[in-house]
Amino acid sequence: MIQMQTNLDVADNSGAKRVQCIKVLGGSKRRTATVGDVIVVSVKEAAPRGRVKKGDVHRAVIVRTAKDIHRADGSVIRFDGNAAVLINKTSGEPIGTRIFGPVVRELRARNHMKIISLAPEVL
């Protein structure tokens, strides 16, 4: 579960290293987000020559959470940390050209096919 003020690792090569959630999209009273949800983030730590700079505000898709992900078949997936992929606000395409680490199959149901195709492993 991701809420406001949560710090996340960035799982792409956009140049950002750490981001902070500043808004959960999807309703005025919505407080938490999970895998596949879109959030608004602020870049807190960035690489020197990346596409994004520290302080930039972007949208991001959550690809990994430390909170359990329960599936219909009874299996449970959990990761060591929280991670997101920065996306373009208008097109919804990832800003980076590579994805690092595994992503979950639930992204397919949310129509984030580009992230699934770039990921090295889909769990």
Curated annotation (Swiss-Prot):
Q: Which GO terms describe its biological process?
A: translation
Question: How is this protein annotated for GO cellular component?
Answer: cytosolic large ribosomal subunit
Q: Which SUPFAM superfamilies match?
A: Ribosomal protein L14
Q: Does the keyword Iron apply?
A: no
List keywords of the entry alphabetically. Ribonucleoprotein, Ribosomal protein, RNA-binding, rRNA-binding
GO molecular function terms noted in the UniProt entry: large ribosomal subunit rRNA binding; structural constituent of ribosome
Q: Which domain of life is it from?
A: Bacteria
The record's note on quaternary structure and interaction partners says: Part of the 50S ribosomal subunit. Forms a cluster with proteins L3 and L19. In the 70S ribosome, L14 and L19 interact and together make contacts with the 16S rRNA in bridges B5 and B8.
Q: What does this protein do?
A: Binds to 23S rRNA. Forms part of two intersubunit bridges in the 70S ribosome.
Assigned protein family: Belongs to the universal ribosomal protein uL14 family.
Q: What is this protein called?
A: Large ribosomal subunit protein uL14
Q: Which organism is it from?
A: Zymomonas mobilis subsp. mobilis (strain ATCC 31821 / ZM4 / CP4)
